[in-house]
A protein has these predicted regions:
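Positively charged, small/polar-rich N-terminal and surface patches that mediate targeting and assembly
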Residues: 3, 7-117
Length: 117
């Protein structure tokens, strides 16, 4: 990402009277596939590479939850966007990379932040 003199990424203006919107998204990706088998680590490596390429950075953490009556571990990727690709593309990419081994992907918009100068 290239920053201009005012600290704004290229293509984004922070001039007087302008506004910028950031969205905090969470991608919950199940660690088990549809048959209850562990999703191969290479699938997560590819998703992390994709996120690192298309978003400014991400936070990764793990969570345990219940889905349809059974306990399931998920990897949670949280990103703060300044645009970037449509979030649904991440789940499409995950399904493309992992095929039938892909786990459930849930996308949640956590927060929308608008700054006006």
């Amino acid at each position: 990402m290239t920053l201009k003199g005012n600290g704004a990424p290229e293509g984004i203006s922070y001039g007087r009277g302008s506004s910028m919107t950031q969205t905090r998204l969470r991608f919950y990706i199940g660690e088990l596939d549809w048959q209850g088998q562990p999703v191969p680590a290479i699938c997560f490596d590819e998703v992390e590479r994709y996120l690192g390429t298309h978003y400014p950075g991400f936070t990764l953490y793990h969570t345990e939850g219940f889905w349809q009556g059974s306990r399931e571990s998920s990897r949670v990727y949280e990103v703060l966007t300044l645009g970037g690709p449509d979030p649904a593309i991440v789940s499409e990419y995950f399904a493309q990379v992992c095929g039938q081994r892909a786990g459930l992907v849930t996308i949640e918009t956590v927060e929308v932040i608008t700054c006006t100068t």
